[in-house]
């Protein structure tokens, strides 16, 4: 699981710096792994579930766990010709 904070554009602000850097590293690892398994019927992608109403996200978070899970399950069940090495939010590719 990644986050919008894993996008390089998020580094313009120092807020939650260590969290952002961990997500940037995760996104980098996603790209490396996707390249390593290319053409092996393995899909490696990164997903941002959004701000989710969980213990970590808190009661103000607008998304339910079920809403967040939709995109994650979709990625986990991509067909063989589905995308790999991408960053997704709500089943849409977003910029790294």
Stretch-by-stretch model annotation:
Residues 1-3, 43-48:
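Structural signature of the Rossmann-like NAD(P)-dependent dehydrogenase/reductase core
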